[in-house]
């Protein structure tokens, strides 16, 4: 079972990824984890990726794609994987398609967690962090007992700069633009499964598991 998990920031991908790997014996493979593993193990591609990152440059697609191929070819991923954070561009989607053909495997489902933009704005702009202990709160989902004050140590709560409405709106806009051609690509292949991510977490999980159970 080879799955790609997609969704905009704030859609709850991390939560659903945890639930999927609890139910199915496949590794959750995120782009960040892949890079860290390749760099730590000092593979040729890992060294190459590190040299770009050390210079503050974007890692080129051919290096990223190579690292993905290495990772999904490992023993623990031979019976399937949950890919999160890749592909990010249509070129990467096409490259992944080629890799899967070379490995004589298929992408079985692309799970896309859909949440209305307004709801994502509420989720992402509501985060508050204690400036002394780092505890995270949410104004709607996990508010402090006293507004603006940490329950644990009485520290002042602040909003991260990248959680302000303007920054969040820009981030969502960029992500929507980037993800549309990828979603269209997988829709044409008949593997795109859209999930309503605005439901309760347990209901979203049930919908995801139902789809995967029927693959």
From Swiss-Prot:
Listed pathway(s): Purine metabolism; AMP biosynthesis via salvage pathway; AMP from ADP: step 1/1
Localization per record: Cytoplasm
LID: region residues: 126-163
Residue sites binding AMP per the record: 31, 36, 57-59, 85-88, 92, 160, 171
Binding, Zn(2+): 130, 133, 150, 153
Binding of ATP, residues: 10-15, 127, 136-137, 199
Pfam families in alphabetical order: ADK (PF00406), ADK_lid (PF05191)
Biological role stated in the UniProt entry: Catalyzes the reversible transfer of the terminal phosphate group between ATP and AMP. Plays an important role in cellular energy homeostasis and in adenine nucleotide metabolism.
Similarity comment: Belongs to the adenylate kinase family.
Domain comment (free text): Consists of three domains, a large central CORE domain and two small peripheral domains, NMPbind and LID, which undergo movements during catalysis. The LID domain closes over the site of phosphoryl transfer upon ATP binding. Assembling and dissambling the active center during each catalytic cycle provides an effective means to prevent ATP hydrolysis. Some bacteria have evolved a zinc-coordinating structure that stabilizes the LID domain.
Protein name: Adenylate kinase
Species this chain originates from: Staphylococcus aureus (strain Mu50 / ATCC 700699)
């Amino acid at each position: 079972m080879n799955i790609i998990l997609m969704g905009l920031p704030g859609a709850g991908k991390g939560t659903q990824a945890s639930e999927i790997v609890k139910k199915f014996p496949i590794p959750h493979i995120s782009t960040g984890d892949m890079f860290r593993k390749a760099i730590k193990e000092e593979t040729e591609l890992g060294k190459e990726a590190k040299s770009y990152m050390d210079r503050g440059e974007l890692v080129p697609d051919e290096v990223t794609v190579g690292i993905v191929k290495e990772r999904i070819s490992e023993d623990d991923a031979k019976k399937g994987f949950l890919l999160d954070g890749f592909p990010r561009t249509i070129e990467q989607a096409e490259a992944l398609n080629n890799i899967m053909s070379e490995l004589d495997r298929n992408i079985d489902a692309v799970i896309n967690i859909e949440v209305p933009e307004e709801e994502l704005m509420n989720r992402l702009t509501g985060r508050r962090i204690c400036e002394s202990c780092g505890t995270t709160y949410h104004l709607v989902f996990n508010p402090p007992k006293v507004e603006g004050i940490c329950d644990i140590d009485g520290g002042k709560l602040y909003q991260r700069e990248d959680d302000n409405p303007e920054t969040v709106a820009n981030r969502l806009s960029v992500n929507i633009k980037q993800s549309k051609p990828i979603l269209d690509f997988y829709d044409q292949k008949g593997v795109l499964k859209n999930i309503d991510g605005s439901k309760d977490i347990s209901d979203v999980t049930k919908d995801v598991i139902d789809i995967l159970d029927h693959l």
